[in-house]
Amino acid sequence: MYQEPHGADAALAPPDRRARERRPFRQQRRPEERVRILGETVDLMRPEEVLLHVERCVEAGQRSIIANHNLHSLYLLPRTPGMRRLYDLADVVELDSTPLIHFTRLLGLHSRPFHRCTYLDWRDQFWSMANRLGWRVLYVGGADGVAAMAAERLSARYPGAAIKGLSGYFDATQGSLGNTAILAAVREFKPNVLFVGMGMPRQELWIADNIEALPRAVILPVGAAFDYEAGVQKAAPRWMGRLGVEWLFRLFADPKRLFSRYCVEPWFLIGPAFGDVREAMRRKR
């Protein structure tokens, strides 16, 4: 600890750093934290920065879309008409892929392991916040009964939050009876946060197609996240995600459905990856 010399002017003494107000993370973004990889834009954000964005939007009653990119979405995007609309509407695009984190490091970008950011990385902090602040949280997705089961389990753990789940098994065509009923149920619930888990690209297309009919809420496509909350799927240990081998856990759990995603689709990204490497080498000259 600093000791003031005898007779020194107290006004000139350096301040005690421990007395200074500390913030757990920066509240201002740096320009270099929005980067382009494989032709698409992503935000290098910590989980706590995502939650700060969510909290601010809820407080302001502001609609905001938080999308995410991984290898699967980067493969689907140029092959799925209409999917890009969701990313054009998004205020934040999380980076949900440890291999992509490693790739951005290779390109010399300002990425770190903690920039891997998706629902499973901040779920506990999110639900604690929702519980404390009394948020209304709605989930649309999953098989019949799964969303309701997840909502029931989460409500037992976080009674301060109002949590509801709606099945994702409905006709999502605009103007259909099923879609109209779901939109009416969403508006009636008036969520602060809306999770949509229908799998890529259906969830992205549904949000983009219906954005004007959705309430002013924070909206996030989250895939099978609530299958984990309902206990119908087992999430990989988080250390596997940090090491970039979570895909192996999921592949062995469901090889028939995921073989193409993990063993075929990445090969189609080699061309754009080489393009990024060439551009990075050109910048360093």
Task: Describe the function of each predicted region.
Residues 2-117, 123:
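N-terminal nucleotide/polyanion-binding subdomain common to many enzyme families
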Residues 37, 99-106, 235-236, 240-285:
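A transmembrane-helix-recognition feature enriched in membrane-embedded lipid enzymes
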Residues 63, 135, 214-217:
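A short helix->loop->beta-strand "cap" motif at the edges of active sites that frequently abuts
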Residues 70-73, 100, 198-203, 225-226:
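Short glycine-rich anion-binding loops that position phosphate/pyrophosphate groups of nucleotides
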Residues 100-185, 189-190:
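Conserved beta-alpha
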Residues 167-174, 215-253:
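Short, flexible loop segments at boundaries between secondary-structure elements
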Residues 186-200, 216:
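Proline-aspartate-enriched helix->loop->beta-strand connector
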Residues 204-213:
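Short Gly/Thr/Asp-enriched flexible loops that form oxyanion-binding sites at enzyme active sites
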